[in-house]
Amino acid sequence: MAKRDYYEVLGVERGAGEAELKKAYRRLAMKYHPDRNPDDKSAEEKFKEVNEAYEVLSDAGKRMAYDQYGHAGVDQSMGGGAGFGAGGANFSDIFGDVFSDFFGAGRAGARGGPQRGSDLRYTLELNLEEAVRGTTVTIRVPTLVHCKTCDGSGAKKGTTPVTCTTCGGIGQVRMQQGFFSVQQTCPRCHGSGKMIADPCPDCHGQGRVEEHKTLSVKVPAGVDSGDRIRLAGEGEAGTLGGPPGDLYVVVSVREHPIFQRDGKHLYCEVPISFADAALGGELEVPTLDGRVKLKIPEGTQTGKLFRLRGKGVAPVRGGAAGDLMCRVVVETPVNLSKRQRELLEEFRGSLQGNSSHSPKASGWFEGMKRFFDDL
């Protein structure tokens, strides 16, 4: 049967570079690898075809001969079955990370020893007051802990793990795959060299069981959404005597009905009456430390910002506290009584012809008049 074009086999253009060839080869080698396709002769043949194509195209000399003469130009240099390992392809370079993903390890001892437990993440919701002042909370976290029945060994009480019969206790097995052989982590003992002949009935040989752990978390003052608190050793238990992982508590601060936070500064809106805005006055505004008095000068407009220094948030890593920025919103009176309406009508009449009472409005009308005059 005629051989397929090597570029077609790898699914690349004839001008493909080294990186593109390598990427295509890795993808196809993973797809057709015999361990992923047991008892599939078609996949095995495609795996060999992919190896052969890459051996030629990854070697500059062989690729040049192939581009000029086709398969005839490289059949002799291939040595009639010298195999993938005899060519220009670098086995460890290409397959080191492939087998690391595929088998869980590609080199001796990669998984043979104790394994650290996985880290855990827990989202902790706080209100603004708790985040600013700091607090201590109790949380319940689902995790994996050492099985107390077998003390984490995975073996039934009174028994011990035995030497793995698949790898003979070395944790690695050598597999012949077509043109080459590969040493991989033992699929039965996962590199430990030991196997559980009589598993623990509680953890089923895993050495760990699911459990909810109750923990006390001290939250420092000044935290904000996205800040993380690390609790060392409070993650999942390790395996084969490995250390536990860590627990990361991620802070999420709920929205506040009054204040908005921006770093160490707080913002709020303060509604004031039309009369207070015009005549000035004094009112109480809320802060996280209680109410404080704010003096409103006469003629205050909507949008005016008043800064209350030091009434913001003290940064979690130290430094001066931020400020509270109060934005004034002048409210228009509604649901007027007859008398109130009469007074406002009288007031409006007194303003006509006197631009000094409304400097912004007067300037706007003057600008509009000039605009239309210029048309």
Swiss-Prot record:
Pfam families: DnaJ, DnaJ_C, DnaJ_CXXCXGXG. Its cofactor is Zn(2+). Residues 5-70 form the J domain. CXXCXGXG motif repeats lie at residues 147-154, 164-171, 186-193, 200-207. GO terms for molecular function: ATP binding; heat shock protein binding; unfolded protein binding; zinc ion binding. The keyword Zinc-finger applies. GO terms for biological process: chaperone cofactor-dependent protein refolding; DNA replication; protein refolding; response to heat. Zn(2+) 2 binds at C164, C167, C186, C189. GO terms for cellular component: cytoplasm. A zinc finger (CR-type) spans 134-212. The J domain is necessary and sufficient to stimulate DnaK ATPase activity. Zinc center 1 plays an important role in the autonomous, DnaK-independent chaperone activity of DnaJ. Zinc center 2 is essential for interaction with DnaK and for DnaJ activity. This is Chaperone protein DnaJ.
